[in-house]
Structures are given as C-alpha cells and as structure tokens.
From Swiss-Prot:
It catalyses: adenosine(1618) in 23S rRNA + S-adenosyl-L-methionine = N(6)-methyladenosine(1618) in 23S rRNA + S-adenosyl-L-homocysteine + H(+). Residues 269-286 have a biased composition (Basic and acidic residues). It comes from Shewanella woodyi (strain ATCC 51908 / MS32). GO terms for cellular component: cytoplasm. This is Ribosomal RNA large subunit methyltransferase F. One of its GO terms (molecular function) is 23S rRNA (adenine(1618)-N(6))-methyltransferase activity. Residues 8-24 have a biased composition (Basic residues). It comes from the Bacteria. InterPro entries: METTL16/RlmF, rRNA_lsu_MeTfrase_F, SAM-dependent_MTases_sf. Its main location: cytoplasm. It holds the Pfam family Methyltransf_10. Coiled coil: none annotated. Specifically methylates the adenine in position 1618 of 23S rRNA.
Length: 382
C-alpha cells in the first residue's frame, strides 16, 4: 500500500486580489451596489468553486424571490441571512441551485439536513482532480506513479476535460446534494443510496421535477442498516468513484449536543459582529439547521466505526470501483483508517485536505487497483 503522502494533504491556496466578474460594473455606483451584495471571498475553497466570492444576493433573490425576506444587511454592510434559521438556509440553497446549477425544483421535507453547497461542491472538485490525475499519469510506470498525489491546486485546469464518470453516493439523504451538483457541474451519472425510503422518495421527486436530471440519477434503497456497499453494488456495476459523508455522531444524545453547540457558536459569532444576541430556543429539534434524521446524523460507533465498516466492505468490491472515497471530519480517525486499509490490502491511499473558512475536513481516498490498472480503467472507460 502506498503510504499516504503529506503532499496529498496540502491545503488549498487562495489567490489574493482576485477580481470577480460579479463585481464589475459600468459605474462606480454600480460597483458599490454589487460589492455590497457579495460577501468576502471564502478562504480555502477550490479554485473552480463558483462560491469562492461568496453569495450574490441580488442575483439570488432575483431568480428566487422566496429568499428575499430572509436577506438583511449585516453590521459590515454586506447582505446575508441568519444561518441558524433552517428556512432561510433552505431558501438560500434552492436559490443557489437554480442560479448556478439550473435546478429549478428542489425541496426537502421538514427535519432533514440542509447542507451548505460551497463545501459540498468542493468535495466534487477535489475528487474530479483525483480522477483527472489517473488519466494524466496513465502512461507512467508503477514506480513513477507510486506516491503520486492529486495535482496541486495551482495546476488544476480552469476548463476541466469531460470524463464519462459513474459515481456512487452512499447515504445521499433527502437533499441528494452530491448527485445534483456532480451531474450539473461535470455531467457525471450517479447511483444514490440511502437506508431511508422517505429520503429516496424525495430524491425521485427532485429528479422528476428537473429534465436535466432525468436518466442520470438512479436511487437504491439499502435494506440492511449494517451494510454500506453490500446490497447496493450489483454484480455488473462498475463505478469510477464512490462518495460518502458519514454520520458524525455515535448517539442521538451526542448529535443533539452537537447541534446545540453549533447553534450557540453561530449566535456568538453574530454577536461578535455587532448583531444583538437574542438566543431563541427552537420549538423542536427539527427546526435546527443542524438537525436531521437518525441516519443522517448518527450511527452506532459514530464516524470511526462507519469508516471501519466501509473500508472492510470495500475489499469485496475491489475490482468494481476505481476509487473509494469518504469525508473524514475527525482527524483523529485517520490513523485507524490507515491501519485498516493496510490490513485489507489497499494499494494506494490518499488524504486530501479541504479548508472552508475556519473549518478543516479531509477526503480519504483508496484504491485496490495498481497504477497501471487504474490507467487502463481510465483509458477504456465506457
């Protein structure tokens, strides 16, 4: 197994003084108005991330007037929303999906997770680079390929080449955010799995409401809550990549405490920026933006156990998937993952750090195929 390289974990580099097309206008007055509507660039986001310059609320409210009541100036004069308000966050997501990803009909039932789009699409950009790296180095020898990292940030292509990619999203939730963004950003095809039939019914409704998604997203129900890939990957399936955002917590109590902690941090952050601190207790847990259904938030053993199970099962499907990947929120869980990956015989392991504002997370990627086998997979991809 190739030892995880620190180079693969390099943090994204942000360019200072980057001029945004959104901030250009024909007059100084127009410049001031547009600048006021756009938040500061989000540090650490991938160079191809459309949201590096924040949110253009003027455009967002124009395409989705439902967002308008939630948008207010903050103490710095920038337009923003209350990110502790789940309805505001849902309205923002719907507007972003419509403006930037041409998805017109998107909704989720009350009480389901409403993920922030900038961080979610970052995952897709980085795994695109992982897949592009396979093709870029497919003609190199295994010795040359050993330890090969994801291309550094400053070499990421501005206009990525088209690749016929089939991806598997484990635990897609009711929002199906990864398939939606992957289809509209890169033209990938997806299979999306979940243990919750309500979530999958909602995903089907989203697909049926958007012609651009038809025929590109298939949903599969996981009937065994103890399994990850088994029962989902069929004998004739071949996936270029698998994605997963594992349940973070080990119990409902831990999940509830985490939600309350995040809500408190948001309130304190708003207070530090000049907002009047008016803590409000939600009527129920489902009203927290950090709420969610059991399968979305927690599982027995938490993230560490989920990753262990995923790695163990991945060996069974070693030749059916080019790359397996997962987000890893807790850095301390990586060492156990590396140990298990060595035990099951993974040939290459990569860890890709992602920075989103003050939040650090990482993508763990592994493959059971040799570099030359991965090169052939890319070359003969259907």
């Amino acid at each position: 197994m190739t030892k995880p390289s620190s180079k693969a974990s390099r943090k994204p580099v942000t360019k200072s003084g980057r001029n945004s097309k959104r901030s250009r206008s024909g007059s100084s007055k127009g410049d001031a108005q547009v600048a006021r509507a756009i938040n500061n660039q989000k540090p650490g986001l991938h160079p191809r991330n459309l949201h590096r310059d924040g949110y253009d609320f003027d455009k967002l409210t124009k395409v989705s007037p439902v967002l308008t009541p939630y948008v207010q100036p903050n103490p710095y004069g920038n337009l923003s929303i209350d990110f502790a308000d789940p309805q505001a966050v849902k309205a923002l997501n719907a507007a972003i999906l419509k403006l930037d990803y041409q998805i017109d009909n998107w909704d989720i039932p009350e009480g389901f997770l409403c993920p922030p789009i900038p961080g979610r699409v970052d995952y897709l950009h980085y795994i695109y680079d992982l897949l592009a790296g396979v093709e870029e180095f497919e003609n190199k020898s295994e010795t040359e390929m050993e330890g090969q990292n994801v291309p550094p940030v400053n070499s990421h292509t501005i206009k990525p080449k088209k690749m016929k990619i089939k991806a598997l999203d484990i635990g897609t939730g009711a929002n199906a955010i990864y398939p939606l963004l992957g289809i509209q950003t890169y033209g990938w095809r997806f299979v999306a799995s979940d243990v919750d039939p309500i979530s999958l019914a909602n995903v089907k409704a989203i697909v049926e409401g958007n012609n651009c998604l038809l025929g590109k997203l298939e949903v599969r129900l996981q009937n065994d809550h103890q399994k990850v890939f088994s029962g989902i990957i069929k004998p004739d399936d071949r996936f270029d990549i698998t994605l997963c955002n594992p349940p973070f917590h080990a119990s409902l109590k831990e999940a509830s405490e985490g939600s309350q902690r995040k809500l408190k941090n948001l309130a304190e952050n708003r207070a530090s920026k000049g907002h009047k601190l008016e803590p409000k207790a939600p009527k129920d847990k489902s009203q927290l933006n950090f709420g969610g259904q059991k399968a979305e938030l927690w599982c027995e053993g938490g993230e560490k156990q989920f990753l262990h199970n995923m790695i163990c099962e991945s060996k069974v499907f070693a030749t059916q998937c080019l790359w397996f990947t997962s987000l890893v929120s807790k850095k301390e869980n990586l060492e156990a993952c590396y140990t298990e990956l060595k035990r099951v015989g993974a040939i290459t392991v990569k860890t890709i750090d992602m920075a989103q504002g003050n939040k650090l997370t990482r993508v763990l990627a592994w493959s059971f195929l040799t570099p030359s086998q991965r090169g052939l997979w890319a070359k003969y991809r259907s």
